[in-house]
A protein has these predicted regions:
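His-Asp-centered catalytic microenvironments across diverse enzyme cores
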Residues: 2-5, 9-10, 14, 34-35, ...
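Cysteine-centered nucleophilic/redox motifs
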Residues: 63-89, 107, 202
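Generic C-terminus detector
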Residues: 229, 234-255
């Protein structure tokens, strides 16, 4: 795994000191260059929990990935730089409650205090978040903070204007290993109940908003100004993926 190539992939040019500023800059760089996407699932390409495969896909093939892929790669990058980082397990909040354990992966980075870091979520906080809950981050019209949730757990809370704080996902700070996510990785790719099998998704943060392709709809959020277009052909979808997400791949259908 070539760290220089990972840094080139995310367009990061700067110091590699072990501090909060560098961690934040690396996170921003990653989120604005590596899409959160599940295109392989809809192309019947199996996602295997293997760091070398994640590196090949994201760095060498200029693709994105979902939480296990992106957070695993970012974990390897931070570890090589010298950060005290660990993989942690989380559970996403869903319409009828909360998802099973290991349904989401995030990272915990220890500096002067512990920070939640996540580069593998469709829309989430862009900054390292201290689990003390002392910091509120704001991006894309949403505020975020970390707080205690139940016994020995924490949650990333979010709220929009004129709404109450609600948990986006729940996590513990216990160190986990990649292979522990195997069952849920398989579930996300195969279950009809999985959000990832229900719709094709590719989304990328930008400096002022977000680019999002969901099935046959492409949306550009530019500083709150929303523009949406319908995707009516395979060729149009592939053009959007290449021009906006820098992804070159064959799309078998667009239904």
């Amino acid at each position: 795994m070539n760290i220089t190539k990972i840094l080139n992939r995310i367009g990061y040019v700067g110091p590699l000191h072990v501090n909060l500023k560098v961690l934040s800059n690396l996170q921003h760089a990653y989120l604005c260059t590596v899409p959160f996407e599940n295109l392989d699932i809809h192309a019947n390409v199996k996602i295997i929990l293997d760091e070398d495969l994640f590196y090949k896909k994201i760095v060498e093939n200029n693709r994105g990935g979902f939480c296990y892929e992106s957070n695993s790669l970012f974990y390897e990058l931070l570890k090589e730089i010298g950060f005290d980082v660990s993989i942690i397990a989380a559970r996403m909040m869903i319409s009828d409650g909360i998802s099973p354990g290991y349904s989401h992966m995030a990272l915990l980075v220890k500096l002067e205090e512990d920070y939640l870091v996540d580069v593998g979520n469709g829309q989430s906080v862009r900054d390292p978040m201290p689990i003390t809950g002392d910091v509120i981050s704001h991006s894309e019209g949403i505020r975020y903070k970390v707080g205690e949730y139940g016994h020995n757990e924490f949650a990333l809370f979010h709220r929009e204007d004129n709404t109450e704080w609600s948990p986006r996902f729940v996590f513990s700070t216990a160190r986990r290993h990649l292979e522990e996510f195997k069952v849920m990785c398989h579930y996300h790719q195969t279950s009809s109940d999985s959000v990832f099998t229900k719709q094709r998704l590719c989304t990328l943060a930008t400096a002022k908003g977000r680019l999002t392709l969901i099935d046959n709809t492409f949306t550009i959020n530019d500083d709150g100004e929303i523009n949406t277009e319908s995707v009516d052909s395979v060729e149009q979808m592939q053009e959007i993926l290449q021009n906006h997400f820098k992804i070159k791949m064959h799309i078998s259908d667009y239904s």
